[in-house]
Amino acid sequence: MILSEAIQSLMTLQAKLAAYGHAMGLLFYDGATTAPKGTAANRGQTMSILSEEHYKLTTGSETVALLEFLDAHKAELDEKQQRMVFLLIKDIRNMQKIPMDEYVAYQQLLVEADDVWHRAKETSDFALFEPVLEKIFETNIRFAHYCAPEKDPYDYWLSEYEDGLTMAQCDEFFATLREHIVPLLKKIKAQPQLDDAMLHGSFPETAQDALSQYLMRTMGLDLDHVGLATTEHPFTTSLGSHFDERITTHYLEDNFASSMFSVIHEGGHALYDTGSADELAYTVLDGGVSMGIHESQSRFYEN
């Protein structure tokens, strides 16, 4: 294998993986925003096919051989290429430990869970969602045992979201925060309460949407690449690359501040993602480096 050709194959592989991620992400986004209520099973069927193809591409012999070759020649790669290879090998090793049928079933489960959660929230019926939530917990615990049997499942997933983080580190950090935050909260609660009547009233959705658009422009978001939709619980997602960011909010007629802060928070996520270098689009280096950094950016703007 010629190194220059292998590097080109590396970029092609990542573009294909990004395309599958784009399609699967769009299914999730559609389900959480505008999809009709009765279409979850339809999306789940499509998700199962896409996730199976994604699994096969990720763990296939050609992919493994390519990355093993590049890893053996990593001294000849630049820093970005080395990181791409490292992250892809890490993903492959984890995915190889999870049976394909279980991986595909889990992707279908998430589509089902999102649909059930929306129905349960509308009626405040946790019992409706509880069985599906238990399945999600059970699956994640099982996957953690597959990938890192020597670790506590929670430590495994913590490290997946924030590389190297452990429960012990979190306990120590939160204990330090508690020492300072609890006295501060008590001090604040002892102060005269502010009159927040101005935040409550009747605020039409059209007016709140106009405020959302104003906030997004003021934050510097490129509205040609960042879209806004309504959903039950606000979130931000990248579709394919940082060139397509979708943020969502939830309007409450009697409390405009709820959506206002949601848009600022989610806008912070989108602003961070869109700051990625264009040369990294459609690679595993595109977007945020970790969940912790991502939340620090969204909270920075919201706070």
Named regions from a protein language model:
Residues 1-163:
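A well-structured
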Residues 24-31, 88-90, 190-191, 243, ...:
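Short acidic (Asp/Glu) and glycine-rich catalytic loops that position anionic groups and cofactors
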Residues 106-258:
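Contiguous, non-catalytic segments that form substrate-binding/exosite surfaces or channel walls
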Residues 252-260, 283-290:
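Alpha-helix N-cap/helix-initiation motif
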Residues 217-218, 222, 273-276, 283-284:
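A glycine- and charged-residue-rich anion-binding loop/surface
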Residues 7, 11-14, 51, 114, ...:
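Short, well-ordered alpha-helical packing segments
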Residues 287-303:
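Post-HExxH zinc-binding segment in Zn-dependent metallohydrolases
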Residues 10, 148, 253, 258-278, ...:
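Active-site recognition of the HExxH zinc-binding catalytic motif
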